[in-house]
C-alpha cells in the first residue's frame, strides 16, 4: 500500500505516526515535529506527524480539549508548510471531515467510533488514507468488518479501496485498565490492511486519575518491542517535550528526548524480524 510518498507493509520497514496528543501551541508543535523529523531522517524511518485539534473524548468536562478546529488545523498546516511533513489528525464527527481533509494527509478515526457505520463511510469517502483504530471493546477479528465497511464505501464512491489501516490500541481489562494481546496484531492482518500498533494509548489507564486518565509510560518500550517483534507495518506513539506538563495524556507520553534511543532499538529489531518469512504463515 502506498501511504503519502512511501510504501507500507510487512515487506517494508515500519513507518511512524508520532507527535503530541493535542496541539498546545504553534511553537511547541513546530519544535516537536522538527525534532522528530531529524530523528526519523537519521534512522530512515518514514514519518507522519500527528496531533489533535480537539480532544472530544475527555474524562472530565473541565479537561483541556485543544485550540479549536480552525487554529489547530492552521498550525498543522504550518507543520506541512515549514517542515514538509505529512500530517495526520483525528476527526470526531461527519461534519468535520471535509474541512479536516482539506488540510491533512491522513485521517484517523477514534477507537470509540469504530462501529459507527455512517462515520466510517464518510471518512472512507473523503479520499484520504484513514487510520482506523480498533475499539477497546472489539475483538481483533471484528476489525475485518470495519475495514470492509470502509472499502465498500470507497468502492461505491469510485475511490481506491487500498487506503485503510487497522490500528490496535489495547483492550479493556476490568476497570481503568487496558492490556495488549500481541496475537491481535497477527489476527488483524486478515483484514489485508496494514496493521499499526499504538504503543502509548495501550499503556493508558482510562479515567484512572478520577478526572483524567493515568498511564504507565515505562511500559511503552516493552509493548513497542513486542509489537515490532510480532511484525507490524507501522507504529503510533505520542510524545511530549515535558510529559509532566502535557495538557492531555501526559502519563502515557514518551519523553521527546527518549524517542531517538527507543526508535533506534525498534529499527534494529524490525530489520531482524523482517529479514525472514513469518513462521506463523506455515503453522495452519
Curated annotation (Swiss-Prot):
One example of a Gene Ontology biological process annotation: keto-3-deoxy-D-manno-octulosonic acid biosynthetic process
Location of this chain's protein in the cell: Cytoplasm
Catalysed reactions, as listed in the record: D-arabinose 5-phosphate + phosphoenolpyruvate + H2O = 3-deoxy-alpha-D-manno-2-octulosonate-8-phosphate + phosphate
A GO MF label: 3-deoxy-8-phosphooctulonate synthase activity
EC number: 2.5.1.55
Gene3D superfamilies registered for this protein in UniProt: Aldolase class I
Pathway: Carbohydrate biosynthesis; 3-deoxy-D-manno-octulosonate biosynthesis; 3-deoxy-D-manno-octulosonate from D-ribulose 5-phosphate: step 2/3; Bacterial outer membrane biogenesis; lipopolysaccharide biosynthesis
Listed GO CC annotations: cytoplasm
Keywords attached to this entry: Cytoplasm, Lipopolysaccharide biosynthesis, Transferase
Residue ranges crossing the lipid bilayer per the database entry: none
Predominant location: cytoplasm
Family of this protein: Belongs to the KdsA family.
UniProt name for this protein: 2-dehydro-3-deoxyphosphooctonate aldolase
Organism this protein belongs to: Burkholderia orbicola (strain MC0-3)
Amino acid at each position: 500500500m502506498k501511504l503519502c510518498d512511501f510504501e507500507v507493509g510487512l515487506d517494508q520497514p515500519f513507518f511512524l505516526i508520532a507527535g503530541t496528543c493535542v496541539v498546545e501551541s504553534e511553537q511547541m508543535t513546530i519544535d516537536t515535529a522538527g525534532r522528530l523529523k531529524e530523528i526519523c531522517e537519521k534512522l530512515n524511518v518514514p514519518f507522519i506527524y500527528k496531533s489533535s485539534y480537539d480532544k472530544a473524548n475527555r474524562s472530565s468536562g473541565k479537561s483541556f480539549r485543544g485550540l479549536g478546529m480552525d487554529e489547530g488545523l492552521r498550525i498543522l498546516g504550518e507543520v506541512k508548510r515549514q517542515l514538509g511533513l505529512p500530517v495526520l489528525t483525528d476527526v470526531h464527527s461527519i461534519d468535520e471531515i471535509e474541512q479536516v481533509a482539506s488540510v491533512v494527509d491522513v485521517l484517523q478515526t477514534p477507537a470509540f467510533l469504530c462501529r459507527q457505520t455512517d462515520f466510517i463511510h464518510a471518512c472512507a469517502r473523503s479520499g484520504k488514507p484513514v487510520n482506523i483504530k480498533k475499539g477497546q471493546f472489539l475483538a481483533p477479528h471484528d476489525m475485518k468488518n470495519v475495514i470492509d465497511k470502509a472499502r465498500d464505501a470507497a468502492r461505491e464512491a469510485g475511490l481506491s479501496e487500498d487506503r485503510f489501516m487497522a490500528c490496535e490500541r489495547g483492550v479493556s481489562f476490568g476497570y481503568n485498565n487496558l492490556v495488549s494481546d500481541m496475537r491481535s496484531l497477527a489476527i488483524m492482518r486478515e483484514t489485508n490492511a496494514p496493521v499499526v500498533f499504538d504503543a502509548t494509548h495501550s499503556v493508558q489507564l482510562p479515567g484512572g486519575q478520577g478526572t483524567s486518565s493515568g498511564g504507565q509510560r515505562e511500559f511503552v518500550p516493552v509493548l513497542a518491542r513486542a509489537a515490532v517483534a510480532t511484525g507490524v507495518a507501522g507504529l503510533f506513539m505520542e510524545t511530549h517535550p515535558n510529559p509532566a506538563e502535557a495538557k492531555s495524556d501526559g502519563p502515557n507520553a514518551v519523553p521527546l528526548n527518549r524517542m531517538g534511543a527507543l526508535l533506534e532499538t525498534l529499527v534494529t529489531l524490525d530489520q531482524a524480524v523482517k529479514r525472514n518469512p513469518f513462521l506463523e504463515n506455515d503453522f495452519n
